[in-house]
Every structure is written in C-alpha cells, then in structure tokens.
UniProtKB/Swiss-Prot annotation:
GO biological process: one example: regulation of neuron apoptotic process
Identification of the protein by name: Sigma non-opioid intracellular receptor 1
C-terminal hydrophobic region as annotated region, ranges: 177-223
Described purpose of this protein according to its UniProt entry: Functions in lipid transport from the endoplasmic reticulum and is involved in a wide array of cellular functions probably through regulation of the biogenesis of lipid microdomains at the plasma membrane. Involved in the regulation of different receptors it plays a role in BDNF signaling and EGF signaling. Also regulates ion channels like the potassium channel and could modulate neurotransmitter release. Plays a role in calcium signaling through modulation together with ANK2 of the ITP3R-dependent calcium efflux at the endoplasmic reticulum.
Organism of derivation: Trichosurus vulpecula
Region ranges (Important for ligand-binding): 99-106
Organism lineage: Eukaryota, Metazoa, Chordata, Craniata, Vertebrata
C-alpha cells in the first residue's frame, strides 16, 4: 500500500512539474512574439464609434482597421456572424483577425445573456459600442457595470460572472494562447446545443484567419 501511494504521489508530482514547465514555456513564447495589434489601439478606435448604431460603428471600424493593418483583416466575403454558446450564455461573434497569439472580433447579443466568463491563457479586452456590460469579479460581493466607450479587461487566469443587456455590442481583442480559448468557446456548442454547423462555422472562421496571416507572412500584404 505504501509503495502504491508513493507511486501515485510520484505521478502527481511529475504531472504538476510538466504543467509548470509548460506554463513557463508558453509565457516565454509569448514574450518573443511580435504582435500586430495593441490593446489600447483597438480600444481607442472602438471609442471613436461608441454610441453609434452598432452596424454603422462596426463597418467604419473595419475600414479603419484595414487601412491601418493591410493584410491582417479578413475580406468582406469571409466575414460571418456566428453564434457562440459558452459558460451558459449565448452571443454572436464576427471574427476579423486571428493568429496563434492574437484575435480581433466583433461580439454582442440582441437579446441579452449572462453566465461564466471562462478562464483563459490570454488577456481579453472588450470596448463597448452599445448597451451595458455587467461584471461580477471572483472574490468580490458587488458587480460593476460598463457603458458605451468603456473597456472591460479580463486578465489571464481570471474568472468573472458576466451579463450583457439587450442590444449590447462590443469590439474584442485577445492576446495570449488563442487556440486554448477555443475549448471554452466551443464547449456548450459540443456538449449542450450540439449545433455542429455552428461548430464548423467557428472553426472555419479561425482557419481563415490563420490562412490570411500565413499568406501575409509568406507573400506580403498585397497577396
């Protein structure tokens, strides 16, 4: 019995060591990355259009992002609004840019929704265009509410309760280990709604973003 218990603890120690090394390797990798976008840049652009009709704001934002970052924003024919079910909430997103370490997307809900934010190996920031964003941070007993023009920052490893009012729309920027965020983003789609067409749309959008980044890297922004 003692031998079995010792072996079990050895495996646990080995597992925790591997996880610690992996986490350290990931953060070292992120430290070497050259990023296309900056959090404050996205927030500042979004604030310019806060309070406008969200469709008008989004169209102007896309034009400006393409001007500032040619070759890094998906073309109109590849932009698609896709449902997202995760953490008990439901919204919709339109992916503009995606790589292994960054993404930019439009997000929101026409009806309102609430649930768990998820924990990520990434920092995620949302700048509100319209509506309200309620956030209840872990370890606190009071929630905060954010309005158009304000930015909500969700740090790596953090978890919150989130609630969006009807017709809440925002611009979201994520930086970190982006593939790791897909596990949460797709969890309810796979295990609850079983909406596999939405699963396909989501993976296709991410694949398109990766393809665009690879093409721009290999052949330049005019390819």
């Amino acid at each position: 019995m003692q031998w079995a218990a010792g072996r079990r603890w050895a495996w646990i120690t080995l597992f925790l060591t591997i996880v610690a090394v992996l986490i350290q390797a990931v953060w070292l990798w992120l430290g070497t990355q050259s990023f296309v976008f900056q959090r404050e840049e996205i927030a500042q652009l979004a604030r310019q259009y806060a309070g406008l009709d969200h469709e008008l704001a989004f169209s102007r934002l896309i034009v400006e992002l393409r001007r500032l970052h040619p070759g890094h924003v998906l073309p109109d024919e590849e932009l698609q609004w896709v449902f997202v079910n995760a953490g008990g909430w439901m919204g919709a997103m339109c992916l503009l840019h995606a790589s292994l370490s960054e993404y930019v997307l439009l997000f929101g809900t026409a009806l309102g929704s609430h649930g768990h934010s998820g924990r990520y190996w990434a920092e995620i920031s949302d700048t509100i265009i319209s509506g309200t964003f309620h956030q209840w941070r872990e370890g606190t007993t009071k929630s905060e509410v954010y309005y158009p023009g304000e930015t909500v920052v969700h740090g790596p490893g953090e978890a919150t309760a989130v609630e969006w009012g009807p017709n809440t729309w925002m611009v979201e920027y994520g930086r970190g280990v982006i593939p790791s965020t897909l596990a949460f983003a797709l969890s309810d789609t796979i295990f609850s709604t079983q909406d596999f067409l939405t699963l396909f749309y989501t993976l296709r959008a991410y694949a398109r973003g990766l393809r665009l980044e690879l093409t721009t890297y290999l052949f330049g922004q005019d390819s």
